[in-house]
Amino acid sequence: MNWNKGGPGTKRGFGFGGFAISAGKKEEPKLPQQSHSAFGATSSSSGFGKSAPPQLPSFYKIGSKRANFDEENAYFEDEEEDSSNVDLPYIPAENSPTRQQFHSKPIDSDSDDDPLEAFMAEVEDQAARDMKRLEEKDKERKNVKGIRDDIEEEDDQETYFRYMAENPTAGVVQEEEEDNLEYDSDGNPIAPTKKIIDPLPPIDHSEIDYPPFEKNFYNEHEEITNLTPQQLIDLRHKLNLRVSGAAPPRPGSSFAHFGFDEQLMHQIRKSEYTQPTPIQCQGVPVALSGRDMIGIAKTGSGKTAAFIWPMLIHIMDQKELEPGDGPIAVIVCPTRELCQQIHAEGKRFGKAYNLRSVAVYGGGSMWEQAKALQEGAEIVVCTPGRLIDHVKKKATNLQRVSYLVFDEADRMFDMGFEYQVRSIASHVRPDRQTLLFSATFRKKIEKLARDILIDPIRVVQGDIGEANEDVTQIVEILHSGPSKWNWLTRRLVEFTSSGSVLLFVTKKANAEELANNLKQEGHNLGLLHGDMDQSERNKVISDFKKKDIPVLVATDVAARGLDIPSIKTVINYDVARDIDTHTHRIGRTGRAGEKGVAYTLLTPKDSNFAGDLVRNLEGANQHVSKELLDLAMQNAWFRKSRFKGGKGKKLNIGGGGLGYRERPGLGSENMDRGNNNVMSNYEAYKPSTGAMGDRLTAMKAAFQSQYKSHFVAASLSNQKAGSSAAGASGWTSAGSLNSVPTNSAQQGHNSPDSPITSATKGIPGFGNIGNISGAPVTYPSAGAQGVNNTASGNNSREGTGGSNGKRERYTENRGSSRHSHGETGNRHSDSPRHGDGGRHGDGYRHPESSSRHTDGHRHGENRHGGSAGRHGENRGANDGRNGESRKEACNRESKMEPKMEPKMEPKVDSNKMDKVDSKTDKTADGFAVPEPPKRKKSRWDS
């Protein structure tokens, strides 16, 4: 709004009547458009001249800036002033009625409620209320009198529970994530992927100053000292103990012989021990003597107490623990459950001396275990990996350890703990005492274990790996998996009526499936395998021990060490992966002399395991069913090993090939005799192309002729001879040394075509390949006859014309393979058998023997002169072809027809009688065998 003084065309005043636009040359800067600019426009300076600026009213500056006449800043000033035209929000006055409503709404009406601000407001309100409540409680406590602080205040347990409720993740570090397979021993054939725990680093013991300690606490009782060596042997035999090692201590037979003090004896009596078990009788004296030990005994035999009692004596002899000291005794075991069980035993007996025990195993709280170790404990029962973790984290150390035990040691070496076990042993002082215990100990594992021992004493109670005879084993052969399920559901209620039932399954997935199926059938049961949380495993075992659940389905994680007396039945629903695991499985019942039953369910595909199971049953004096034996015989390795030394006996399987592989317990003697109709002389056995050229063909022919000759018809007397020589002449298994004929064959001497003749016209050099069963041990008068007969006739059929010198050399070296058989005599490795035949031909035993040995040999041996062999007896000629048969016939006659001996004596030359002792001895098999002549020693004498 401009003030105009008036002039030509312009009214005086503010110019409400019209507007004027200045038309002068010099334009005045435009004023910012404001609300009052509509009242008038700037006019030209018509009255004051061109250069005079217009005069503004005095109230012009109200609500506006001073005009900026600087052209350079005009542009920016316009923008700044344009932004000031924004309308300001409405702000009600203090006493306005709308102010309260204004405050109840957020300033920014477009945004919603912020949840974080609402939550924080609630937290603040809650905190305020809690503080107010606490203040009120404090006031009440001050006002009320007669309050006992020891009751009202929180004790340690309440404080701990409150703290854990407020801090559920307390003590859990990031490294302690769930790793359920760390110590899993469920027995899967494929080793599960485990958390790799690096072993402890090597340590230089020479830099550490270890204090000395005493290991030997055994004072032998006078009753034991007074035992004679024979009585000591009888005592160990009675306890079924086998002890090896340097100077083992004598076993005790009662607790009085151990020399325990009254405190420990009170605890032992409280545990209802009446007398020590066999492994304790020998193991406790060995451990008290400070010796390293390998203890092997069947399951449930008291191995745990055998190393815990000496451990307490060992600990009590040393000074008390100081702050920062590690344990004195460390017991290492493979599974968590076994660790907890040994820990419970250690606490029970350690109460006698107020000794502390700590269980350290995977799955437990690392923080709690570390705290218990730092507080100090004389005994630590642990699994290998967790102990290594604690040593690495400085929760404990092994400097004071002087008593180290590995329970179920073979399992730890077998499960892949070997490096960890060795690193633990290497971190303990070198002069420690180390004990290894297990129920099974294979030779390979024992060699590995001996590296950490020094001059150990090996104590074996019973047989290594033998099953407990208190457990009755029953094997069920079923057709398939569904058959096993039907069998189980049909019998399970019956089993639970007699006691708790433990079901073993090989794989974890199968265990869960079986448990779920049984639950659907309405059975109350528990499940235990390596993938479960440790708390769940503990709860299941606790409920099973308390008989809250009658059935437990488990993998092999429960196969070792669990001592639950209520288990009366063990069922191997799946077979174990090896016989050692099977032994431990069935050992969960029949504990401490109690009786139990173990069922093993087999299917046709389990033939490999059936062979091991047969031997396990036989070793425990259990019944082996025919079905189980037939299943085991389907396995080739068992069938072959069964032939060599087993109890089985197979039917005669004839036909081509090397028959001895198919005949268990039969036919070592008859293998030495082929049929001379097939091969008439040694020329047929020349190896033409190689070491096994025609030799293999000859062997096959010999065996074929052997079977053909079994059933040749003949007269009554000849049948006797034939049956005795060819059918029942002491067949033994290939590789054995017990080749003793069982029947007389003399009746067939006078029959040229008798079965004994056809059966014995064989080739003595090819019987029982690979063994020495055909060679006699003590046979008489070969030397005597050889000496006397070398001077007689040169009527050998093959006409090799062996000289007397050759004959004498053969006689003296009949035990070697030097005798002359014409062209082929030196080709035959079994030539000692021809010499043995001569040894067996005692003149005083046979009326025809002197003539039989004159020209009986068609092999060109030339050791017997004359042709009386052919005229006297065809049997003698045949025996000449096969010295082994002649030997056998003489041996049979010595047993079956002793009445012939006096008749034979007159026909024996006086020179022979000078060199032959007519006395005969009985062998261990009950067969009469004459004493050997006085002659030079041969290799058979040894």
Curated annotation (Swiss-Prot):
Chain spans, region Necessary for interaction with TP53BP2: 738-833
Region feature Disordered, mapped onto this chain: 1-114, 182-203, 737-762, 783-942
InterPro entries according to UniProt: DEAD/DEAH_box_helicase_dom, Helicase_ATP-bd, Helicase_C-like, P-loop_NTPase, RNA-helicase_DEAD-box_CS, RNA_helicase_DEAD_Q_motif
Gene Ontology MF: a single term: ATP binding
Residues covered by the Helicase C-terminal domain: 487-632
Annotated Pfam families: DEAD, Helicase_C
Binding residues for ATP: A297, K298, T299, G300, S301, G302, K303, T304
Cited SMART domains: DEXDc, HELICc
Entry's localization field: Cytoplasm; Nucleus
Comp. bias intervals (Polar residues): 737-760, 786-798
Post-translational modification Phosphoserine, affected residues: S58, S96, S104, S109, S111, S185, S754
Residues that bear Omega-N-methylarginine: R12
Record location of the Glycyl lysine isopeptide (Lys-Gly) (interchain with G-Cter in SUMO2) cross-link: K899
Listed Basic and acidic residues bias regions: 820-924
Disulfide bonds: none
Coiled-coil parts of chain: 116-157
Catalytic activity: ATP + H2O = ADP + phosphate + H(+)
Biased composition (Low complexity): 35-52
Principal EC category: hydrolase
Function: ATP-dependent RNA helicase that binds to partially double-stranded RNAs (dsRNAs) in order to unwind RNA secondary structures. Unwinding is promoted in the presence of single-strand binding proteins. Also mediates RNA duplex formation thereby displacing the single-strand RNA binding protein. ATP and ADP modulate its activity: ATP binding and hydrolysis by DDX42 triggers RNA strand separation, whereas the ADP-bound form of the protein triggers annealing of complementary RNA strands.
Family, per entry: Belongs to the DEAD box helicase family. DDX42 subfamily.
Listed PANTHER family: ATP-DEPENDENT RNA HELICASE DBP3
Name this polypeptide is given: ATP-dependent RNA helicase DDX42
Gene: DDX42
